[in-house]
From Swiss-Prot:
Organism: Xenopus laevis
Entry GO CC: nucleus
Residues of the DNA-binding region: 47-115
Protein name (record): Transcription factor Sox-11-A
The protein's assembly and partners: Interacts with nlk.2.
Biological process per Gene Ontology, one example term: neuron differentiation
Family matches, as PANTHER family: SOX TRANSCRIPTION FACTOR, TRANSCRIPTION FACTOR SOX-11
Region (Disordered): 1-24, 114-170
Gene3D superfamilies tied to this protein: High mobility group box domain
Subcellular localization, as worded in the UniProt entry: Nucleus
Regions of compositional bias (Basic and acidic residues) in chain numbering: 1-11
């Protein structure tokens, strides 16, 4: 009985020692065929990484689980092994940590030039794999080339020489890249070409450029308005070179010969009054030409001014041009202080609107026969 009990106890202890030895044999290099120089290489020649403590332990436990439940999925086995490894104490992990260190040193001795380089898995596009290779997307039309061929928001030339404002833009498409060729048609001096750099900017930068362009347009508009305002008085005076009324300057000694043109712009039509042969005439100092008091009309038309001139011509015919006058002077037509804007802008006023009263200046101006009493000399051009 004693022998049989000893035999039974020895039989019970042997499996335990076998399992422990088997575990260490599984994690030892002998199980990996240490004699083989390619013990840590794959069939393709890739050198595997040295196992750490968890890999040594999980390799042993994975074999046990696969023997007990061969139908269990590999992902489920890994999940259970991870939970169990976290529940182990540090004392239970020590033998596996030592075995992993020994394997690491052996790995360094066998493969001194080894460097960890993780494999780069090629990204497989399912849509591209389904299509035949002849119909695959060309590199010229790939999304990358589209993003690269994105339009530039603003193209600013570097001003050189005269700083030409116009640029001839030519886009040449070659090999999936857009090349912009800019040439300045107006080159000053040595015909320096404007070098333009295309910069891909964000939306914020595009908004800033648009604001800058708006400011530049406003500045150009203000400069244009200012130039028009500067040119406007000159245009007015050039178009409407019209005196308010003819004046008599008795101080000048020379006679004025020629024609004076009256210009009046009303509703797009021009009215010309040409007085010819205004020469030095002998007049009677006592004789004066008086105008019948007429109410000044608020609105004058060419017909009203024609009637007024006709009255003046009738009064001029009543004078005697043959009597000598030593105090007669020259007739000159000059500008007076009158706002010419009313004439050029088509206002309702006229140069021939006289007030109801006759001032001394007016009586002196129209004194004497300073126009010949011939209707042929009064040319009215409408």
């Amino acid at each position: 009985m004693v022998q049989r009990a000893d035999m039974d106890s020895s039989q019970h202890t042997e499996p335990s020692t076998d399992t422990e030895e088997g575990e260490f044999m599984a994690c030892s290099p002998v199980s990996l065929d240490e004699s083989d120089p390619d013990w840590c290489k794959t069939a393709t020649g890739h050198i595997k990484r040295p196992m750490n403590a968890f890999m040594v332990w999980s390799k042993i436990e994975r074999r046990k689980i696969m023997e007990q439940s061969p139908d269990m999925h590999n992902a489920e086995i890994s999940k259970r092994l991870g939970k169990r490894w976290k529940m182990l104490n540090d004392s239970e992990k020590i033998p596996f940590i030592r075995e992993a260190e020994r394997l690491r040193l052996k790995h360094m001795a066998d493969y001194p030039d080894y460097k960890y380089r993780p494999r780069k898995k090629p990204k497989v596009d399912p849509s591209a794999s389904s299509k035949p290779p002849a119909l695959t997307q060309s590199p010229e039309k790939s999304p990358k080339s589209r993003s690269a061929g994105r339009k530039c928001p603003k193209l600013k030339p570097s001003h050189s020489g005269s700083g030409s404002k116009s640029l001839s833009i030519k886009s040449e498409y070659s090999g999936g890249s857009d090349e912009y060729v800019f040439g300045s048609p107006k080159a000053s001096g040595k015909a320096a070409a404007a070098a333009v750099k295309c910069v891909f900017m964000d939306e914020d930068e595009e908004e800033e450029e648009e604001e800058e362009d708006d400011e530049e347009e406003e500045d150009e508009l203000q400069i244009r308005i200012k130039q028009e305002e500067d040119d406007e008085p000159l245009r007015q005076y050039n178009v409407a070179k019209v005196p308010a009324s003819p004046t008599l300057s008795s101080s000048s000694a020379e006679s004025v010969e020629g024609a004076s043109m009256y210009e009046d712009i009303r509703n797009g039509t021009r009215l010309y009054y040409n007085f010819k042969n205004i020469t030095k005439q002998s007049t009677i100092p006592q004789a004066t030409i008086t105008l019948a008091p007429r109410p000044a009309p608020t609105t004058t038309s060419p017909a009203a001014s024609h009637e007024l001139l006709f009255d003046l011509s009738l009064n001029f015919t009543q004078q005697n041009p043959q009597l000598p006058d030593p105090n007669s002077g020259n007739v000159s037509l000059s500008l007076v202080d009158k706002d010419l804007d009313s004439c050029s802008e088509g206002s309702l006023g006229s140069h021939f609107d006289f007030p109801d009263y006759c001032t001394p200046e007016l009586s002196e101006m129209i004194a004497g026969d300073w126009l010949e009493a011939n209707f042929s000399d009064l040319v009215f051009t409408y």
